[in-house]
Regions:
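Short, flexible loop segments at boundaries between secondary-structure elements
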Residues: 142-150
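Residue-level recognition of beta-strand->loop/alpha-helix junctions
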Residues: 37, 91-93, 148
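A short acidic, glycine-rich active-site loop
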Residues: 55-71
């Protein structure tokens, strides 16, 4: 049925739980996984001297994002290794995480996206899904399995 599962993560607790559940599903199906992380780009600065105290330079931002991506994707890699599931990881820079998830699923020919119901920003009271999950469901042309903690 499903042979290649894209598992996006933002590093939130629910996203990490979803990643582990996605790996378990992949093992049960005999599928491989691709862990995916989309990071926001650094805001360009014109003059370093004008950078407010506490703000990172673009290079510092890049290093922080790389460290965060390694940490977030490491959860998926560790779960996949323990389960004996083939795994690769991808990290991109994007202002639009849902679009990046859709593009990655298409580019890598994933036949399922397995993602958390919501990420870092959480849910509004009237929502069942987070905004990025909703966008992937609405705009992707592939199956999406949404993991929701009960």
């Amino acid at each position: 049925m499903f042979k290649h599962i894209l598992i996006p993560t933002d590093g939130s607790k629910l996203s990490s739980e979803a990643a582990e559940a996605g790996v378990r599903l992949a093992k049960a199906l005999g599928a491989r996984v691709t862990g995916f992380f989309a990071a926001p780009p650094a805001t360009p600065i014109v003059y370093k001297a004008l950078l407010p105290v506490g703000y990172a330079t673009p290079d510092e931002h890049r290093k922080m994002i790389e460290k965060t991506a390694r940490s977030c994707l490491g959860v998926i890699e560790k779960a996949a290794k323990a389960a004996g599931v083939p795994c690769e990881t991808v990290s991109v820079t994007s202002d639009f995480p849902a679009d990046a998830i859709i593009a990655a699923a298409k580019k890598r020919r994933c036949d399922l996206v397995f993602m958390a119901s919501h990420g870092r920003r959480g849910l509004r009271r009237s929502s069942l899904l987070g905004s990025e999950t909703q966008k992937v469901l609405s705009n992707g042309n592939f199956p999406v399995l949404v993991y929701r903690k009960m």
